[in-house]
Design a protein with these regions (language model features):
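The feature marks short-to-medium sequence segments in extracytoplasmic or secretory-pathway proteins
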Residues: 65-106
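Surface-exposed edge beta-strand/loop patches
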Residues: 28-31, 122-164
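Post-signal-peptide N-terminal segment of Sec-exported extracytoplasmic proteins
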Residues: 38-72, 132, 136
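Short, solvent-exposed, Trp/other aromatic-anchored flexible loops in extracytoplasmic proteins
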Residues: 89-140
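Hydrophobic beta-strand positions in extracellular immunoglobulin-like domains
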Residues: 62-64, 79, 111, 128
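Sec-dependent bacterial lipoprotein signal peptides
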Residues: 1-20
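Bacterial Sec signal peptide processing site at the extreme N-terminus
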Residues: 17-36
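Beta-strand secondary-structure signal
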Residues: 57-61, 74-76, 106-108, 123-125
Length: 164
């Protein structure tokens, strides 16, 4: 009888432990709670925004998808109105400063005293040094603009070649 109780106890313990493992595995997406996403040739960016008494908070992840490693990363975010006038800006230096390919780093900025209105935009600017193999590092700048409320990318208009 005691042998049967031991077997049932071990079985119950294994079932409960495996359920914990499956539950933890299901929660491993680092961008699950970040509703806005942008993908470019060099970085993937995922973020969320929320208002506090200090202003507009932007928190997210920056993932290197192109280079063997990037370093000296500066991420700047600008709040623009519909006429592209800068209403607020902030910069951060994501840590760690060296991001290997397929690794990501968290970032956070506060656009102080910012209260976005309908039609406002966020412009993300990523300044970094990229290194591919043994060729040394090159400085790059990557940027994109999105609607503040939806995260939908706004393509910048390209002027006709005859316009100067």
């Amino acid at each position: 009888m005691s042998f049967l109780i031991k077997i049932i106890s071990i079985w119950a313990m294994l079932v409960s432990l495996s359920a914990c493992t499956l539950n933890e595995y299901a929660r491993q997406s680092p961008v699950a709670d970040l509703p806005y996403r942008h993908s470019d040739f060099d970085f993937k960016v995922a973020w969320k925004t929320y208002l506090t008494g200090q202003g507009l908070n932007i928190e997210g992840l920056l993932k290197n998808v192109r280079y063997a490693q990037v370093e000296s990363v500066t991420l700047s975010v600008f709040l623009l109105n519909s006429a592209n006038k800068v209403l607020a800006s902030a910069s951060t230096f994501p840590i760690p400063q060296t991001i290997k390919m397929d690794y990501y780093v968290p970032f956070g900025v506060i656009l102080k005293n910012a209260a976005p209105k309908k039609g406002d935009r966020l412009k993300f600017l990523i300044d970094y040094k990229a290194q591919e193999g043994n060729d040394g590092a090159s400085r790059w700048i990557s940027y994109f603009t999105v609607e503040e409320s939806t995260g939908i990318e706004i393509k910048e208009s390209i002027k006709h070649p005859d316009q100067w």
